[in-house]
Regions:
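Bacterial Sec-dependent N-terminal signal peptides
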Residues: 1-26
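Noncatalytic carbohydrate-binding groove/subsite architecture in carbohydrate-active enzymes
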Residues: 232-238, 242, 257, 261-266
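Long, repeat-rich segments with strong aromatic
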Residues: 249-351
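Extracellular glycan-targeting catalytic surfaces
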Residues: 25-239, 248, 272, 316-317, ...
Length: 387
């Protein structure tokens, strides 16, 4: 619990940084943060005690990572369907043994109820830890200029993407397997939906003494191969064809990796197509009907809005404005936030199914991206409730 709270504070802090103070500085290739504004915060930290406290918290979190290691994909105790230990593997989150079958196969779906046995396969946790650790370490390096944070971040990236004994092949062929039914699904791509956060971190680390040109080249090659897999594989095409939040996060992944790999034409096409996606996902009143079908409808609505916030933020990097795009019948990201805010503030009772508790974490992160982009009075007047 303490780790999750600290991570939430870190994420909020880093997003807030991207909306404050501007100075002239060489801008690295960042996709979710505005480096010039972040550099302004670093400069202000010399005299601003509040910023100093936030940086101290960031540094504390980074210090806790220095002695940690992530679990390699080769360390899992289960054989992958293809037999290659370097392949990523995970089980479908909401699938459970069928109690009516002697062997429990095939597994059956219980939407919104996560099977804890899935944690026995550690690849998802390993990748998730990689993203969290590299993101934290890279920003600690930037704000403190302490090379030890960069060195640790680069070592983790080598461990996951480069070292022949421990690397992961750049694909998700066997993600979110349904036991007794398949060997992996496109829907499993959602496992790595927070990669865009780490790409900002990698770009920061590229300026460090710890990352060699060979390291940077190999890491970029890994992501270039992963991007090709996302666009051409059976699983990638399946996820591309989805309609709900999976589609939005798929496009966010493709766009961020394309920008990271210098393929702006690919990213621009994603952002252009997002206008059609917006028309298909949102209703004119702001509802996201495909998310409202879920057993945790509030959570999935918030989750999808976060994807839209990330996608819109990245679109700015190529001078495209999704924040203010509106279809002829009024569908827009703005309407999406306006719809959910009264429920988030408990001004209205949630009208759809929500079997889990209402948690504002995802919505809070989505709203932070909207600062300076959208005018949401309910948020501006109640910001403390989302901190």
């Amino acid at each position: 619990m303490k780790k999750n709270i600290a991570l939430k504070v870190l994420v909020c802090f880093l997003i807030i940084l991207s909306f404050l103070g501007i100075i002239n500085a060489q801008t690295p290739k960042l996709f979710l943060a505005d480096f010039n504004k972040v550099a302004g915060v670093k400069k202000s930290a010399v005299t601003n005690k509040d910023i100093q406290k936030q940086i101290a918290l960031l540094q504390k979190n980074a210090d806790q990572i220095l002695d940690k290691q992530i679990v390699s994909v080769v360390e899992k105790q289960f054989a992958t369907p293809c037999g290659n230990k370097h392949e990523y593997m995970s089980l479908a989150s909401y699938y459970w043994p069928d109690p009516s079958k002697p062997d429990g196969l095939p597994y059956i779906r219980k939407d919104g109820q996560r099977n804890p046995d899935n944690d026995k396969i550690t690849d998802h946790k390993g990748f998730d830890d990689l993203i969290k650790y590299v993101t934290t370490l890279s920003w600690a390096y930037y704000f403190t200029n302490d090379e030890k944070y960069a060195a640790k971040g680069v070592s983790l990236l080598r461990f996951w993407c480069i070292d022949t004994a421990t690397y992961m092949l750049p694909n998700l062929n066997h993600a979110q397997i349904i036991m007794g039914t398949d060997t992996g699904r496109g829907i499993g791509i959602i496992d790595v939906h927070m990669i865009p956060n780490m790409l900002d971190g990698i770009s920061i680390l590229e300026s460090s003494a710890s990352m060699s040109k060979a390291d940077a080249k190999a890491i970029h090659q890994w992501f270039d191969q992963f991007l090709a897999w996302l666009q051409t594989s059976v699983n990638g095409k399946q996820e591309f064809a989805t309609k709900n939040n999976h589609k939005t996060y798929y496009e966010t992944l493709v766009a961020s990796i394309a920008l990271f790999c210098g393929k702006q034409d690919v990213a621009k096409q994603v952002f252009t197509n997002a206008k059609t996606l917006m028309a298909s996902q949102f209703e004119p009143d702001g509802k996201l009907p495909l998310e409202l079908e879920r057993t945790n409808a509030f959570s999935y609505t918030s989750f999808c809005l976060k994807a839209w916030s990330m996608l819109s933020t990245m679109a700015e990097k190529v001078n495209l404005d999704l924040w203010h795009f509106q279809t002829n019948d009024g569908r827009s990201i703005q309407k999406g936030f306006e719809y959910i805010m009264p429920y988030a503030l408990a001004e209205k009772k949630w009208e759809y199914q929500q079997i889990g508790p209402i948690n504002l974490k995802e919505l809070s992160q989505a709203l932070l991206f909207t600062k300076g982009k959208l005018v949401i009075p309910e948020y501006n007047n109640n910001a403390s409730k989302f901190s």
